[in-house]
From Swiss-Prot:
Name of the gene this protein is made from: menD
The protein's name: 2-succinyl-5-enolpyruvyl-6-hydroxy-3-cyclohexene-1-carboxylate synthase
EC numbers: 2.2.1.9
A Pfam entry, by short name: TPP_enzyme_M_2
HAMAP family: MenD
Domain of life: Bacteria
The reaction(s) this protein catalyses: isochorismate + 2-oxoglutarate + H(+) = 5-enolpyruvoyl-6-hydroxy-2-succinyl-cyclohex-3-ene-1-carboxylate + CO2
Entry's family note: Belongs to the TPP enzyme family. MenD subfamily.
GO-annotated molecular function: 2-succinyl-5-enolpyruvyl-6-hydroxy-3-cyclohexene-1-carboxylic-acid synthase activity; magnesium ion binding; manganese ion binding; thiamine pyrophosphate binding
Alphabetical keyword list: Magnesium, Manganese, Menaquinone biosynthesis, Metal-binding, Thiamine pyrophosphate, Transferase
Oligomeric and partner information: Homodimer.
GO BP of this protein: menaquinone biosynthetic process
Cofactor note: Binds 1 thiamine pyrophosphate per subunit.
Cited function: Catalyzes the thiamine diphosphate-dependent decarboxylation of 2-oxoglutarate and the subsequent addition of the resulting succinic semialdehyde-thiamine pyrophosphate anion to isochorismate to yield 2-succinyl-5-enolpyruvyl-6-hydroxy-3-cyclohexene-1-carboxylate (SEPHCHC).
């Protein structure tokens, strides 16, 4: 039996199984040992079953796949060769695990006889990602002793675990040489595949799993709790779940606190600012019940409120993951937000607390005065909605600016917002944004800090794949300005935290064949954004700001509002 032919048969069954589990995008890094998998992925692309993407940097490739999976809400497959190529996927796997994004990670491996004996590019790959995958599938070296039906069943069981929990399935696939001399005809006619002929011409999985009917029932004490003083807190949510939360909370007369990732229009904007007011915060803590939708809040003030609240606490979240870092004694609903709302009709009543609305109005005027008309980090955050395309999506990086956007920006209802807030790292942000562009097939606006951009420069190469207008705003405050918030000596901050680079990104844009602009005023910015939306490709727009302006304004707003005396 030809080893190369059977390697391909083995790979064919793996990839055909994944396609039947919803995979339609395959992200591939170049490598020799992964050739059987790559060639079968190419065959599937030629048949119209998948679209393949390539990238030379496995770390960026992992985040690119993550972005596609976020936008499509379908699993994405990744193929890499053996050795440290596999390890470079770890950051994306961690982020996927934290946020329940489904990826199938296929790592080609040397065969067992080459492990731990000094063989080239052979590392210990079995279970190498520890507990971060929802399932680790350590396949044996391809052998006809194992039936194709066994292989499919093993993979589908792992896929079932993924559907239940959300996250990564790691499939380690050792291959012996030779890898290259198999023909498609020899693979398709191999006797090992004969029991699968009927399955291969269909699109159904091997095992049919009936979908669970998760009907949301009204809580037995809802008629009691809906008469009480409540606070609705909304974190990261899929866009389709955001509709209706605002009107529901308003009808109840309850206070609504929203994260920028929620897609919910706030009734009392600038929560991250006005929650700094101690008087209002203390009154808010007198609520009888908090109902939280989603999780992973950016706002420090919202997190502080959740930590301090000791009353009745309900969490509505569909993933089933533990998402209460403050360990409340709570009632948990594993449900989508809009399904839960339908099962819990509101009781119309007047607002029980008026100070948040008064403070919010005060903040609106005060913030406008403080921000001014120049093009700065804060004015960019405040006026970001004016730069967004209709029917587009927004990706926010992890930097000072995401906090300014969360504090100052009011987005249209259900405008899709994507972030990497599972582990909140600065790695892979450009790659994720590129993947979201591919997965959504919509215009994309990405807002990323300069240090994050430097960290992921290779991923600019991925934007060659986009087919919709894509604007990458790089907010260049000359290093990690977010560290200005730390109570550390200024000299130590520069040397060990901020790390100023004193550069710009014009030559980087040229290297990756990206359109580039560096506007100095709002008029210039509006003009270059309009031009960018006329092109179905990526444009890098660099906005240079004074290093401490954004953090200084942010701290000033918090300080001023914390002592404000506002009459309801």
């Amino acid at each position: 039996m030809s080893v190369s032919v059977f390697n391909r048969c083995w790979s064919k069954v793996i990839l055909e199984t994944l396609v039947r589990q919803g995979v339609s995008h395959v992200c591939i890094a170049p490598g020799s040992r992964s050739t059987p998998l790559t060639l079968e992925a190419v065959r599937l692309q030629n048949a119209g079953s998948v679209t393949c993407y390539t990238h030379f940097d496995e770390r960026g490739l992992g985040f690119f796949a993550l972005g596609i999976a976020k936008a499509t809400q379908s699993p994405v497959a990744i193929i890499v060769t053996s050795g440290t190529a596999t390890a470079n996927l770890y950051p994306a796997i961690i982020e996927a695990r934290q946020t329940g994004v489904n990826l199938f990670v296929l790592t080609a491996d040397r065969p067992p006889e080459l492990w731990e004996c000094g063989a080239n590019q052979a590392i210990l790959q079995q279970n190498m990602f520890g507990q971060y995958p929802v399932a680790n599938v350590n396949l044996p070296k391809p052998k006809a002793d194992y039936s194709a039906q066994w292989l499919i069943s093993l993979l589908e069981q792992a896929a079932f675990q993924q559907k239940q929990q959300g996250g990564v399935v790691h499939i380690n696939v050792p291959f012996s040489e030779p890898l290259y001399d198999a023909t498609d005809e020899a693979v398709d006619s191999h006797s090992w595949l004969q029991p699968l002929q009927r399955w291969l011409i269909q699109t159904k999985p091997w095992m049919n799993v009936e979908a669970q009917q998760n009907e949301v029932l009204m809580h037995e004490n809802w008629d009691h709790w809906r008469t009480k003083r409540g606070v609705v807190v909304v974190g990261q949510l899929p866009a389709e779940q955001a509709m209706g939360i605002n009107s529901w909370a308003s009808a109840m007369g309850w206070v609504l606190l929203t994260d920028i990732q929620s897609g919910v229009v706030p009734t009392t904007p600038y929560e991250d600012i006005w929650l700094a007011n101690q008087t209002v915060r203390e009154k808010l803590l007198q609520a009888d019940i908090v109902i939280q939708f989603g999780a992973r809040f950016i706002s420090k003030r919202i997190n502080q409120f959740l930590q301090a609240f000791k009353g009745e606490f309900w969490l509505v979240e569909q993933s089933g993951k533990a998402l209460d870092p403050y360990h409340h004694s709570l009632t948990r609903f594993n449900a989508k937000a809009h399904h839960w709302l339908r099962a819990h009709p509101p009781l119309r009543q007047k607002p029980w607390l008026l100070e948040p609305l008064a403070l919010s109005k005060f903040c609106a005027t005060f913030i406008e005065q403080q921000v001014g008309g120049n093009l700065t980090e804060a004015s960019f955050a405040l006026r970001l909605p004016t730069l967004l395309p209709y029917n587009g999506v927004l990706f926010l990086g992890n930097s000072l600016l995401v906090r300014l956007v969360d504090a100052l920006t009011q987005l249209p209802e259900s405008y899709p917002v994507y972030t990497n807030r599972g582990a909140s790292g600065i790695d892979g942000l450009l790659a994720t944004a590129a993947g979201i562009g591919i997965g959504s097939n919509k215009p994309v606006v990405a807002v990323i800090g300069d240090t994050s951009t430097l960290y992921d420069l290779n991923s600019f190469a991925l934007f060659k794949n986009v087919t919709q207008p894509t604007v990458i705003f790089v907010i260049n405050n000359n290093g990690g300005a977010i560290f200005d918030m730390l109570p550390v000596d200024e000299q130590v901050k520069d040397q060990f935290y901020r790390l100023p680079h004193n550069g710009d990104f014009s030559q980087i844009a040229a290297m990756f064949d990206l359109k580039y602009a560096h506007p100095y005023t709002w008029a210039d910015l509006n003009s270059v954004v309009k031009q960018a939306y006329s092109r179905r490709k990526a444009t890098l727009i660099e906005i240079k700001t004074n290093p401490s302006d954004g953090s200084s304004l942010y701290k000033r707003l918090i300080e001023q509002i914390s002592h404000a005396v506002i009459g309801a």
